[in-house]
Amino acid sequence: MNTENSFSQLYSELSLNPDLPTLAGRCMLLTEILLDCNAHPQTQPVCRCLGAYLEEVKSGLTESMRDFQIVEFEEDAEPPRQKAWLLEDTETKCDYCRAVNHVLLVSHFDRDMLPYLTGLLHEVAHSMAGDLITPAQPRMTIHLPARH
């Protein structure tokens, strides 16, 4: 199992087909764990797991955004240079996360660079998750007048 596509088979939670907010939450957690790693060998298992989750996020974004692709334009409208999706920035952030995770997984780099690479991955993953996780709605409180 040496391809990123086979990673998802290694993690039983992924077989439950979690939704995008759950996947994004796991990515945030894994990047927080990476921040505590201080040697390249420590990052390997976390990066493998993160890679599986990022692949699921990527495929989930692709699937969920398929309905939002722009397929026709008005005559005077300028067509987009690339695909125009509702969450295109989120998909780009996911791709950035996948790229930095790949560097952490396969590259040999100076030990001094580890905190910067994990920090970058953490920041982008949290930004991506912020796009996917909607904050809980505050409960509405109704104050009734006191009876005297």
Regions found by a protein language model. Give the residues of each.
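Sequence/structural signature of long amphipathic alpha-helices
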Residues: 1-148
